Amino acid sequence: MILLAVLFLCFFSSYSASVKGHTTGLSLNNERLYKLTYSTEVFLDGGKGKPQDSVGYKISSDVDVVLLWRNPDGDDDQVIQVTITAVNVENAGQQRGEKSIFQGKSTPKIIGKDNLEALQRPMLLHLVRGKVKEFYSYENEPVGIENLKRGLASLFQMQLSSGTTNEVDISGDCKVTYQAQQDKVVKIKALDTCKIERSGFTTANQVLGVSSKATSVTTYKIEDSFVTAVLAEETRAFALNFQQTIAGKIVSKQKLELKTTEAGPRMIPGKQVAGVIKAVDSKYKAIPIVGQVLERVCKGCPSLAEHWKSIRKNLEPENLSKAEAVQSFLAFIQHLRTSRREEILQILKAEKKEVLPQLVDAVTSAQTPDSLEAILDFLDFKSDSSIILQERFLYACGFATHPDEELLRALLSKFKGSFASNDIRESVMIIIGALVRKLCQNEGCKLKAVVEAKKLILGGLEKPEKKEDTTMYLLALKNALLPEGIPLLLKYAEAGEGPVSHLATTVLQRYDVSFITDEVKKTLNRIYHQNRKVHEKTVRTTAAAVILKNPSYMDVKNILLSIGELPKEMNKYMLTVVQDILHFEMPASKMIRRVLKEMAVHNYDRFSKSGSSSAYTGYVERSPRAASTYSLDILYSGSGILRRSNLNIFQYIGKAELHGSQVVIEAQGLEGLIAATPDEGEENLDSYAGMSAILFDVQLRPVTFFNGYSDLMSKMLSASGDPVSVVKGLILLIDHSQDIQLQSGLKANMEIQGGLAIDISGSMEFSLWYRESKTRVKNRVAVVITSDVTVDASFVKAGVESRAETEAGLEFISTVQFSQYPFLVCMQMDKAEAPLRQFETKYERLSTGRGYVSRRRKESLVAGCELPLHQENSEMCNVVFPPQPESDNSGGWF
C-alpha cells in the first residue's frame, strides 16, 4: 500500500510539472496551416527615462506555419516550415506623426526590395523533442535579415516539462530554466551564461568599470501541444560605476499569437530529413541558429586623414585643458580602431611637432594590432630627438585599458635594444611592470610574455647588472606587485642604502594587506625600531605605515611607546598618524583604542609633543555607495626643511578601490643652506629634491628637481619659478565595448569611453633672504565620459548617446618659514570651481538617411573650496598669512 502511495505521488508531481500532451515539445497537427501574427519591438532610453521618452521601432508581420514531415518512428521528430508575410515597420510605443521616420514610406522602401524578399522566403526547422536541431535557410541572405528569421525560429524551441538545461538558439549556448504549469510554460534564459562569439572588452578596475544586468523571460500559452500565444521580453541595462548618470537600457519584446488554423498541405513522406529538405527545395542549406555578426559599413564617413584634420586644432597644447580636446581624442580613437597601419603611419609622419604628442596618445590608446605596428614603426628609441614622444607612448601603454600579450612582448623587445636616453629605458621597465599587473588581473599570469617579464624584474633585483638599475627594477615591482617579490623587498628595505631602502618600503606599502604577514611585519618592526642599523626618518615612518595596515596588539603598543623617544619632527608625525587613524576610523583604529587603555601608553607627556609635521585624511565626496578621499602627510627635518610631502586621492565604490593619484615631493641634505644640524642618520646625505607620482594605479618615472649641492646652487641662481611637469597628456581611462545579440534577431551595441587631459606639475622654491620655502603641486584635468547605445536591424537603427564633461583643478601649497623654532608651516589645498555639463541625444535613423533626433542638456557649477585640514594647520596659517586690516578709504592724511 505504501509503495502504491509513493508511485502515485511521483506520477502526480510529474503530471503537475508538465503541460498536458504526449510530446516533450511543440507539436503540429497533420495537414493544418497555422496562421499567426508576429511582432518584435525595441525601446531604448537613458536608464531611468519614461517609456514615452524612449526611441525604438517595431517590426510586425503575419506568420504561416505548417508541418512538412513527422518521423514515423516518433512524434517528437518533425520538420516545420515558417513563412513571414505582410511585413510592416513603424514606431515603437508612441506615434510621432509627421516626425516619424516611417511616415509616407512603404515597407519595400524602408527595408529594401532585396531584404524584403529574403525576409519573406520560408525557413525550415528540424525539431527534435522540442529543440531546434537544424535551421534551414537560403545561402547568402543578408546577415541582418537572417538574424530576424533566427529570432522568430528560436521562439519555437521549448519543452513542456519543468527543469534546467542548456539550449542553443540565437543567443548562443545558454542555460535555460523551464517552469511548466497547466497550459502555460515560462522559460527563463540566463543571459550571462550564453556562449557566443562577439567582440568586446572592458576596463578591469571596477571603479572605472560598468555594471550591467540582463534578463530574458518568455511565456508560452499552450493548447493541444501548440502555442496560442508567446510573449518574450529581454532587458539589458547598464550603468557606469563611477558616474551613474551614464546609463542605458534596452527592452526588446517579441509577441506571437495564433489567429486561426485552416486546411494545409499534406506531409512529405520519407524517413530521412535530408530527403525531405531536398524535396522542398534543393537550395536550402543548414546554417547555425546562433546569431551571426552584423558588420556595419559606414557610408559617407570621412577618412582618417579628414577626421584628424577636423579635430587637430582642439588638440593643440593651448586647448588641452578644455573638454573639447578630450571629446575629440575619444572620437578619434574610435576611428583609429577601424583604420589600417598605413593610414595611421601616414598621419604620424605628416604631423608637426607641437601636436604630435597628443596624436601619439591617441594612436597608442587605440590598442589595435595596426595602431601598435604604426607607432612602433614611427618611434625610434635610438634617437634623442623624440624623447617626449617616446615617454608619451610609454605612459599611454601603462594606462592601457585592455592590454594584450603583444604589447608586453613589444616592450620586452624594446628593452633588450639600445636607447638614446636612460630615462626612457627606465620608463620602459616601469611600464612593463604595470602591464604585468594588468594582464595578471585578467587571468593572464601564465602567458609566455608575462612569465618572461616577471623573471626579468625579479632577476634584476636578485642580481642587478648595474647598481643604479636597482631603483628601476624596484619601481617596476611597485607596478607589478608580484607576491614572489616580497622577500627581495624586505632585503632591500632593511639592508639597502637610504633612497633604495625608502623605495623598497614604499613598494611594500602598495601591497594588499593580505600580503603583510607576521614575517613581513617582523622585518618592518626592526626597521622602525632600528634594531640592526640606523635608518632615515622617511624609511622608518613608511615602515610604520605598512605595519599599521593590520597591526597586532604588540605592534601598536611598541609604536606608541616609541613616541617621545623619536627625533622631534618624527615624534609629531607619528603622533598625527595615530590621531588620523582614530579620526578617520581606519581598520587599525580598534586595535589602537584597545592599547590606549593602558596607562603606561596613554599619557600626557607622550601625546603633547610639539612640531610641524602632520598627517590628515578627509573626504572629497561621500555617498552611501561611493566615496572619494584625500590624504596629506608632511614630514619635516628637525631644522624645518621639508623632508617629504605625500598627497593621495583614492576613489572607492563598494569594496573596489582606485588609487587616483599620488604626488610625493622628497628633499634631503639641505640643512647646510641654513647652517642647521642634520637629524640622526642623515648627516651624510647628498642634496636632492625630486617628485614621484602614481596616476590611476600606475607608478610613473620620478623626476628630479636637483641632485647634488652644485646642481642645487645652479638651479637656485637660474631659477625661473616655473613648475616641473610630472605627467601631461591625454589618457583613455574608461573603455567598454560590447556587441549584444538580442534574441529578437536585432543587434545591440554598447560603447562607453572616458578620457581626460591631465597636467600634474610641481615646484619647490627657496628664499635664503626671507628664510622661507614653498612647495606647490598643481593638478589640472578636463574629463569627458561618453556612451553610445544602439540597436540595429541593418535597415533601421535607434540609439541613445550620453555625455558628461567637466574641467577641474586641485592645488596644494605648503609654505614654511624657518626663521625661528618651532618654524611656521601653512598647508593649503584648494579645489577650483568646476562646471559640470551633461548631454543626451536620442535618435532613430533609416539606412536611407532619414532621421529623428531629440536632444537634452543640463549644466551646473560645483563651487570651489579649500579642503579642510587639521585645526593646528588653520591656526598656523593665520600666523603665516595674518588677516589684512581693512583699509581706511577716508582719503585724509590723518
Curated annotation (Swiss-Prot):
Name a single GO biological process.
low-density lipoprotein particle remodeling
- Which ranges carry the Vitellogenin domain? 28-658
Q: Which GO terms describe its molecular function?
A: apolipoprotein binding; ceramide 1-phosphate transfer activity; cholesterol transfer activity; lipid binding; lipid transporter activity; phosphatidylcholine transfer activity; phosphatidylethanolamine transfer activity; phospholipid transfer activity
SMART domains registered for this protein in UniProt: LPD_N
GO CC annotations, alphabetized: basolateral plasma membrane; brush border membrane; cytosol; endoplasmic reticulum; Golgi apparatus; microvillus membrane; receptor complex; vesicle
The record, for Pfam families, names: MTP_lip_bd, Vitellogenin_N
- Which keywords belong to this entry? Cholesterol metabolism, Disulfide bond, Endoplasmic reticulum, Golgi apparatus, Lipid metabolism, Lipid transport, Lipid-binding, Signal, Steroid metabolism, Sterol metabolism, Transport
Q: Which reaction does it catalyse?
A: a 1,2-diacyl-sn-glycero-3-phosphocholine(in) = a 1,2-diacyl-sn-glycero-3-phosphocholine(out); a 1,2-diacyl-sn-glycero-3-phosphoethanolamine(in) = a 1,2-diacyl-sn-glycero-3-phosphoethanolamine(out); a cholesterol ester(in) = a cholesterol ester(out); a triacyl-sn-glycerol(in) = a triacyl-sn-glycerol(out)
Phenotype seen when the gene is deleted: Lowers plasma and tissue triglyceride levels, and increases cellular free cholesterol.
* Annotated localization: Endoplasmic reticulum
| UniProt keyword Signal, yes or no | yes
Keyword Endoplasmic reticulum set for record: yes
Q: Which residues form the signal peptide?
A: 1-21
Induction per the UniProt record: Up-regulated by FOXO1. Expressed in a circadian manner in the liver.
Cross-referenced PROSITE patterns, in alphabetical order? VITELLOGENIN
**Per the annotation, which location comes first and is thus the protein's main one?**
endoplasmic reticulum
Q: Which cysteines are joined by disulfide bonds?
A: 174-194
Q: Which domain of life is it from?
A: Eukaryota
Tell me, what does this protein do in biology?
A: Catalyzes the transport of triglyceride, cholesteryl ester, and phospholipid between phospholipid surfaces. Required for the assembly and secretion of plasma lipoproteins that contain apolipoprotein B. May be involved in regulating cholesteryl ester biosynthesis in cells that produce lipoproteins.
Subunit organization = Interacts with PRAP1.
Q: Which PANTHER family match?
A: MICROSOMAL TRIGLYCERIDE TRANSFER PROTEIN LARGE SUBUNIT (PTHR13024:SF1), MICROSOMAL TRIGLYCERIDE TRANSFER PROTEIN, LARGE SUBUNIT (PTHR13024)
Q: What is this protein called?
A: Microsomal triglyceride transfer protein large subunit
The species is Mus musculus (Mouse)
Taxonomy-wise, where does this protein's organism fall, top ranks first? Answer: Eukaryota, Metazoa, Chordata, Craniata, Vertebrata
